[in-house]
């Protein structure tokens, strides 16, 4: 299997993040996504492993790509394809919602 490493950079008001996929080229889903970066205000580093995030088709297979999700204890980081970063505690407690910008 060919393993392709691809990376993207997302900058929001609070975070500077790099998203790196370590999955094979052509995979629809990936459970080996690395997010590294830093909180720009506190300087605190962030390193989490996550997965791609998709809608689910009627047959149960992944459909449209939505972005990425990362889990850190009770927190879930959602990074939308549009660059929106949301951090949610538990099921519904929105801790952060910021529009970011993807950079090359």
Where would I find each of the regions flagged by the language model?
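Cysteine-centric segments in proteins
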Residues: 3-104
């Amino acid at each position: 299997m060919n393993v392709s490493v691809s990376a993207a950079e997302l900058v929001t008001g609070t975070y500077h993040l790099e998203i790196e996929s370590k999955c094979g080229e052509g995979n629809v889903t990936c459970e080996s996504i690395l997010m590294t970066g830093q909180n720009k205000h506190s300087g605190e580093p962030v390193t989490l492993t996550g997965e791609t995030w998709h809608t689910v088709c009627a047959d149960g297979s992944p459909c449209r790509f939505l972005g990425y999700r990362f889990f850190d204890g009770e927190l879930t980081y959602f990074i939308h394809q549009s660059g929106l970063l949301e951090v949610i505690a538990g099921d519904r407690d929105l801790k952060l919602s910021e529009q970011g910008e993807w950079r090359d």
